[in-house]
Regions:
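Catalytic Tyr-X3-Lys loop
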Residues: 40-73, 92, 116, 171
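C-terminal helical subdomain
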Residues: 136, 158-189
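Residue(s) in the substrate-gating loop at a strand-loop-helix junction
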Residues: 96
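Alpha-helical segment proximal to the catalytic Tyr-Lys
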Residues: 81, 125-126
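Conserved Rossmann-fold SDR core element
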Residues: 21, 117, 127-143
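Active-site loop-to-helix junction immediately N-terminal to the catalytic Tyr of the SDR YXXXK motif
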Residues: 102-110, 122, 150
Length: 189
């Protein structure tokens, strides 16, 4: 994500629609190079043909942090300039429950979303005197095109990973996007 390009987009939006009052930062995603093959490390994994913590690719980890964290920081820098000193302006960041209770196998994603949660708290204090309210939501697990093949077999049955995730989910099911609407509207009002 290029800061200058994002600032140009912010200026174009401002010209077309006026000042930005609401910014929702929804950047998110993972990279296979930033995941482990197994949930738990075992002594023999160092020499095995298994991708472990020790094999995480720094480029993959950087990709995940750039996508999630810089994908929140840079748009906020670009659009929040228009909010300074005005009333009723809001920044809403999308974090994840992984920030608080990390799933196994996805250390970079969990770490990047933890960075979003921490950054949101910092930014809320930082902007508190200039009329910009900053919050985040941290949804649980949702099925998306990006993760569908990890959660369901080709015949539509649940994978072992899905069974484990749902066993640790109080409602025993994945979330639905429309269930976030009330929280979003409340935080942006």
């Amino acid at each position: 994500l290029d800061k200058q390009s994002c600032e140009n987009v912010a200026l174009d939006v401002q010209k077309d629609s006026g000042n930005c009052d609401i910014l929702v930062n929804g950047a998110g995603g993972n990279n296979p190079k930033a995941t482990t093959d197994k949930e738990y490390f075992e002594v023999g994994d160092i020499d095995a043909d298994t991708k472990s913590f020790f094999d995480l690719d720094s480029d993959g980890v950087s990709f995940v942090f750039n996508l999630n964290f810089l994908g929140t920081l840079i748009p906020t820098q670009a659009f929040a300039k228009q909010m300074v000193g005005r009333e009723g302006c809001n920044v809403l960041n999308i974090s994840s429950m992984n920030a608080f209770t990390p799933l196994t196998k996805i250390p970079a994603y969990s770490g990047a979303k933890a960075a979003i949660s921490n950054f949101t708290e910092w930014l809320a204090v930082h902007f508190s005197k200039v009329g910009i309210r900053v919050n985040a939501i941290a949804p649980g697990f949702f099925v998306t095109k990006q993760n569908e093949s990890l959660l369901f077999n080709s015949d539509g049955t649940k994978t072992q990973r899905t069974e484990k995730i749902l066993a640790a989910t109080p409602m025993g099911r994945f979330g639905k996007a429309e269930e976030l609407e009330g929280a979003l509207l409340f935080l942006l009002n």
